[in-house]
Amino acid sequence: MAEQKIISLFDDDACTRYTILIASTIGEMREKKESIIDNTDPEIVKYLSQLLDVFRENFDTWAMAVVNRTGCALDPSTPKDQVEVKKFRQFSETEKSECFIKCLLLLILSLGNYSPYSRNLLYSIAEKLGLSSIVVYKAELITSSMLLDTFQTMESNQEMYELSGTRKMRRRIAMGLAGLAGGALIGLTGGLAAPFVAAGLGTLFAGLGLGTMIGATYLGTLITSAPMITALFGGFGAKMSMQQMGDVSKGLTDFEFIPLSVQSHLPVTIGISGWLGDYNEVDAAWKSLTVGDKSYYWGDIYALKFEVEALVDLGKSLSRILFSAGLGWVKGEVISRTILAPLAAALWPLSLLKVGNILGNSWRIAFNLSIKAGEALANALCVRAQGMRPVTLIGFSLGARTILECLLHLADRGETNLVENVIVMGAPMPTDAKLWLKMRCVVAGRFVNVYSASDYVLQLVYRVNSAQSTAAGLGPVSLDSNTLENVDVGDLVEGHLQYRWLVAKILKERLGYDNISDAEIQSLAVQEEKYESKQRTYYSQKEQEEEIEQEVLFDASSDTELAIQKKEDEVNEVRENKK
């Protein structure tokens, strides 16, 4: 096909070298997955045999599509544009590699999707070519901007608006679903897209002096196909911004993706909090990902909002355990019984169990809802709310549990090529290797378990409310490091609530994501100090008020009216100061 004979830039040697590089890298990706299986207990492999077969089938289908597409494009027998080939030969090796990576990105996108496997392939090849990951980040950014600009330009064209003249489509535009409507417009006027795409490619290959229309053909029919563009970006964010998520979130009173930084980038990141300090803090823990000149690495960033009332109630209960002076003894009691003398929760002192039960009610409610949210998240990903783009999931506390439940549901459905990276912190999840391997089968990239043995709050609530003795958020999961990264943050986290302010610090300093802003990490540390100070003051006043009220009740049994009045005045004074 003419559209497949698209690269007239590389000479024969380069075509052969790059073809081999693509094939060998894909082979290594498959071998890496297979090695996870080879190093696993045979009983577990037997348990996961059906899922592993699905993974192999999905991977091989993807690999064949990529090999066929790039193989045709890099066929040495394809006629070459000698002017462009001459330019290419004058490039340095770094420039040649950079040019190839950008062409490979366009070729992959021409398949109509940008899957986690595809993104892993791109970054792996870039690393082999000695390129910084920043080259790929910027190529993704420029390419997505190019497609978005094309989309918006056509959508604003009056002639195209008239073509969308049905009442239904105009009503959609009025409702704010311009992403869906605009997708239809592209289909009606696809031929007008090429000039705008060419301009974008000029930016992508800036400084290399290449003909932009050669690059334009790399995208194949993507530049003129409404279904492909709309599917790739999920209606340019329209699907993820819709509040009507009833079909995927049955059993939940609220379930919504809150956009933090959404500019139709190629990757998608979703942050999920496991408790909230207030009703308006759904996105607070994830704003740090949007700060800095490298924040585009995360792509389109969303915070998942679900069952806010339950998560706020849980946050209040956790704060009471951590910051109430009257419960200061809990920390030492839990640690001594966990580290010095590990015991089942049933053998713990009654006083400690009572504290656990105080927290337990709000925990159990939120815990059960987080499991439902995990299924709803899996539903949303399966219907491609994110489009055909790779997704990174990051969560702490019950947000981590939501993510892990989502992975289990994806595994049950055989969806092995939706999620790129997963990072869970303080996860209240059993350390059963069988479960974690099952989840690993649906994570294409990094899978990270961040834990703290010093997290005495999680120790308390998990032991009281679970039959399991150990949570993944308290210690490592016994799997090979190539399968799962276990990261110890015991020197940073001891109170569970701290994950809320330490997400950015952990991502940068412990997991190597250098796109996080140092200034933002420092700002979060200050915010944490202010929050803790405010909470301690609040519970100190609350305890003082409760203590005085108890004294009033005690003195009321005497006949000393003056003493009673004095105590009542003290209570009123405390209440007034609190206001």
UniProtKB/Swiss-Prot annotation:
Protein family according to the UniProt entry: Belongs to the TMCO4 family.
PANTHER family assigned: DUF726 DOMAIN PROTEIN (AFU_ORTHOLOGUE AFUA_2G12860), TRANSMEMBRANE AND COILED-COIL DOMAIN-CONTAINING PROTEIN 4 TMCO4
TM helices/strands, residue ranges: 173-193, 196-216, 218-238
Protein name: Uncharacterized membrane protein C6F6.13c
UniProt source species: Schizosaccharomyces pombe (strain 972 / ATCC 24843) (Fission yeast)
Keyword Cytoplasm: yes
GO cellular component assignments: cytosol; nuclear membrane; nucleus
Entry-linked InterPro entries: AB_hydrolase_fold (IPR029058), DUF726 (IPR007941)
